[in-house]
């Protein structure tokens, strides 16, 4: 117990000899004991500090975070708050164990530990999703699904809300305001353009992997909308190894999803026939 107390305590722990007063050989029922434990850090101030951190953490959710460094800073702060909460939980639990008052709070601590385990499992699952998507975006965004495709230059991973039958990827040419940069946009999320699209994209979730095939490309002459190109993907019902693709010259064939993209830099003259 002393080892754990010294490990999980800020400051120092003073272990004092047990002192029992008012005890007599005839009557030991009314004896009073002194807890042989004294922490140099005021526990109340630690709890108040973590409470303020939790309030500040909740307040930051109302602030618009658009840039990646802002999202990374917020997620890092959130992770530190969770670690502090776990520290306070273990610290207070060990103090109650040393005081012999653990039984009254056992169910409360069991609930807290259960919630902490869920949070830890969620972090592990997000890391696994990062590995599947080959990107750090699952750690930055809270979306449950991500639209991914991979080229020679870049691994794209854009947050997505749910599994749908159709996905529309909007390519901005960097001319329209207020966005003066080339990017790909899906449902309010965007990622800078580093290379072109592929003939298929994959929606990754915790236990989901759905393939979508490129069906058509709509340019300004098709839609009347300037400075944007739309790539329309439809959900595949076939097995992933047998993806039917449409090449630029109109021929069709069977390709493996691991193949290189047919084109890497779509232009305003690029059109994929249905």
UniProtKB/Swiss-Prot annotation:
InterPro entries: a/bCoV_VIROPORIN_3A-like_CD, a/bCoV_VIROPORIN_3A-like_TM, Protein_3a_bCoV. Changing residue 27 to G: Complete loss of O-glycosylation. Glycans are attached at residues 27-28, 32, 34. Changing residue 121 to A: No effect on polymerization. Changing residue 20 to T: In strain: Isolate Shanghai LY. Changing residue 148 to A: No effect on polymerization. It comes from the Viruses. One of its GO terms (molecular function) is monoatomic ion channel activity. Pfam families: bCoV_viroporin. Changing residue 117 to A: No effect on polymerization. The chain crosses the membrane at residues 35-55, 79-99, 105-125. It is a multi-pass membrane protein. The keyword ATP-binding does not apply. Exists in both O-glycosylated and non-glycosylated forms. The glycosylated form is associated with the virion. Changing residue 81 to A: No effect on polymerization. Keywords: Apoptosis, Glycoprotein, Host cell membrane, Host cytoplasm, Host Golgi apparatus, Host membrane, Host-virus interaction, Inhibition of host innate immune response by virus, Inhibition of host interferon receptors by virus, Inhibition of host interferon signaling pathway by virus, Interferon antiviral system evasion, Ion channel, Ion transport, Membrane, Secreted, Transmembrane, Transmembrane helix, Transport, Viral immunoevasion, Viral ion channel, Virion. Residues 56-78, 126-274 are cytoplasmic. GO terms for cellular component: extracellular region; host cell Golgi membrane; host cell plasma membrane; plasma membrane; virion membrane; voltage-gated calcium channel complex; voltage-gated potassium channel complex. Residues 145-237 form the CoV 3a-like viroporin CD domain. Signal peptide: none annotated. Changing residue 222 to N: In strain: Isolate Shanghai QXC1. Residues 1-34, 100-104 are extracellular. The second or the third transmembrane region are responsible for Golgi localization. Homotetramer composed of two homodimers linked non covalently. Interacts with M, S and E proteins. Also interacts with the accessory protein 7a. This is ORF3a protein. The lineage of its organism: Viruses, Riboviria, Orthornavirae, Pisuviricota, Pisoniviricetes.
